[in-house]
Each structure stands twice: as C-alpha cells, then as structure tokens.
Amino acid sequence: MPTWHYSVRVDEEKSAKAMVWDAPISYKKIVELARLLKGMKVDEARRFLERVARGEEPIPVRRYSGKQAHHRGLAAKYKWPIGRYPVKAAKILLRLLDNVTNNAEVKGLDTERLRIVHIAVHKGRVLKRWMPRAFGRATPKFKKYSHIEIVVAEEE
C-alpha cells in the first residue's frame, strides 16, 4: 500500500491540515479554483465558494481555456476574460474547507483568524472504460479523480 504525505512542511501547533483523496473531479476543472483560494482568509474563501457553487460568480480559466466562453466582469476583476462556473469543484472545496476548519477548532486555533497558506491539487487515477459502438469501434468513458490538500494557519 503506498503512503502519501503533504507536499509542504508547516508548524504543527499553529496550523491545521485536511485532504480529499480520490475526489470525483478532473484535475483541470479544480486546479484553477484552488489557485484562486491560496492566500484568502477561510471565511472569505467560504463566501466566495458559495457564490461559485450557486453559479453567481465565474472564475478565470488560464491554463485549460480552449473553447471557453468570455464572461462579463472577469476582465475587470482578474485581467482575464475567459472563465467558467465550476459548481461541482466548488462544492468539493467547500466540504474540504469545513473539514480543515473543524480540524483547526479541535486543535484550539482561532477560526476567525485562519488563512489558507497552502492548497494543492494532484492528479489521481483514471478509470478507463469503453462503450462498444457500431462497426467494431469503441468510445472511451474515462472517469478522472483528483487529490486535494489544504493547510490553514493562524495569522498573527
């Protein structure tokens, strides 16, 4: 059985960690949203993710932006007009944010002063399935997974 560690070392007394292993979402759909959250306060990140999960606020898509639509307000806020509404990714990150907040509360940290100091998304496994089609062809039905880790710390 393989072991897995966090990709950053932090002070254990002043920080809290959480991870999601094999989240049922593609890497390219969640990595842009995770990149936006780094450096935010936990309460601010929660409000932002709730707006994204309701489909009220788009996020900029810089890396995997092929054939993506332009959205109003993105160019003014992020200096990038291409974006999307990752509702499923926002819901997964909201659950992860709740987990790390609960971990911080158990450790005795002040949850009002928590800031996201590290968030990383790693590619997970791919379940490769094939759907048979006519004339001997087959269509791929791949299910992609991701691993997400988050570290929050109390700011002074």
Swiss-Prot record:
InterPro entries: Ribosomal_uL22, Ribosomal_uL22_CS, Ribosomal_uL22_euk/arc, Ribosomal_uL22_sf. It comes from the Archaea. PROSITE patterns: RIBOSOMAL_L22. Keywords: Ribonucleoprotein, Ribosomal protein, RNA-binding, rRNA-binding. SUPFAM superfamilies: Ribosomal protein L22. GO terms for cellular component: cytosolic large ribosomal subunit. One of its GO terms (molecular function) is rRNA binding. One of its GO terms (biological process) is cytoplasmic translation. Belongs to the universal ribosomal protein uL22 family. This protein binds specifically to 23S rRNA. It makes multiple contacts with different domains of the 23S rRNA in the assembled 50S subunit and ribosome. Part of the 50S ribosomal subunit. This is Large ribosomal subunit protein uL22. It comes from Hyperthermus butylicus (strain DSM 5456 / JCM 9403 / PLM1-5). The gene is rpl22.
